[in-house]
């Protein structure tokens, strides 16, 4: 008798719940870890209340000791704490795949760099792509990139997690995939601002396109490949996050563009818009590597320095012309 694979999902927010549903479609036994667990037979969770969890998903408040793979689906800012505790109980051979997007605010570290400190020697990877949680949870067609420094591991994990509705592509550019996933949240805020402020579709298209070049420069400076920006984790995620109203970061930008104060926007939300915290950390990372990131810098100044939208417009458009 063949033993069914065991997949552990750490974090039961919207994306964690969606990934539990998606991976359950592989036929594996899925464990979904919650910080404050509900009764084990509960089939609906607060972040996606219209979704019924498959029967092969088990909810728990205990970290797994063994699994074929662990998906870490916590916010970036809590990944250090959770992964440190997970490391003490999890078999050292079990790979951990981070599914969060952003930079640790205090250190400007990408998620896998955090795991390198908290889980030294462990095989790790990153999963990222143009995915709204509710659509993945419903089983609608979607795709993403799973990247590991070891391509063979990435291929093994994509074979384990791939389904007929959630298609995964293997990559060995973990640095580029992470960087793209983090930066797109910042760019999405800028894209939302352009529409909310009535600057037009042309402005949004220009911002997204120039952001690809900007993120590509930063990816290369941090050990990634600019070519990764042409894939699902780059352009795919940018298009979705910068145009879809289901994007938390884009919707923050929309409200900012309409004139609502940032503090009021954040106070009214129960979910995290990672781009708000990632923006200053991303700018610090770019300055560390001497990379020009005018869009990221302008969004950061809008969020943190009181720069007006009109001033931001001139900061971007009044720069000397350059070649593309």
From Swiss-Prot:
Range of residues in the leader sequence: none
SUPFAM superfamilies listed in its UniProt record: 6-phosphogluconate dehydrogenase C-terminal domain-like, NAD(P)-binding Rossmann-fold domains
Key words, A-Z: Cytoplasm, Lipid biosynthesis, Lipid metabolism, NAD, NADP, Nucleotide-binding, Oxidoreductase, Phospholipid biosynthesis, Phospholipid metabolism
Enzyme Commission code(s) on record: 1.1.1.94
Stored InterPro entries: 6-PGluconate_DH-like_C_sf (IPR008927), 6PGD_dom2 (IPR013328), G3P_DH_NAD-dep (IPR006168), G3P_DH_NAD-dep_C (IPR006109), G3P_DH_NAD-dep_N (IPR011128), NAD(P)-bd_dom_sf (IPR036291)
Residues annotated as catalytic: 184 (proton acceptor)
This protein's record includes keyword Metal-binding: no
Residues annotated as binding NADPH: 15, 35, 101, 133, 248, 272, 274
Enzyme class, broadest EC rank: oxidoreductase
Subcellular location: Cytoplasm
Gene Ontology molecular function: glycerol-3-phosphate dehydrogenase [NAD(P)+] activity; NAD binding
Domain of life: Bacteria
Residues noted as binding sn-glycerol 3-phosphate in the record, renumbered to the chain: 101, 129, 184, 237, 247-249
Pathways involved: Membrane lipid metabolism; glycerophospholipid metabolism
Chemical reaction(s) catalysed: sn-glycerol 3-phosphate + NAD(+) = dihydroxyacetone phosphate + NADH + H(+); sn-glycerol 3-phosphate + NADP(+) = dihydroxyacetone phosphate + NADPH + H(+)
Gene Ontology biological process terms in this record: carbohydrate metabolic process; glycerol-3-phosphate biosynthetic process; glycerol-3-phosphate catabolic process; glycerophospholipid metabolic process; phospholipid biosynthetic process
CC annotations in GO: cytosol
Record function comment: Catalyzes the reduction of the glycolytic intermediate dihydroxyacetone phosphate (DHAP) to sn-glycerol 3-phosphate (G3P), the key precursor for phospholipid synthesis.
Family according to the record: Belongs to the NAD-dependent glycerol-3-phosphate dehydrogenase family.
Name under which the protein is recorded: Glycerol-3-phosphate dehydrogenase [NAD(P)+]
Lineage of source species: Bacteria, Pseudomonadati, Pseudomonadota, Alphaproteobacteria, Acetobacterales
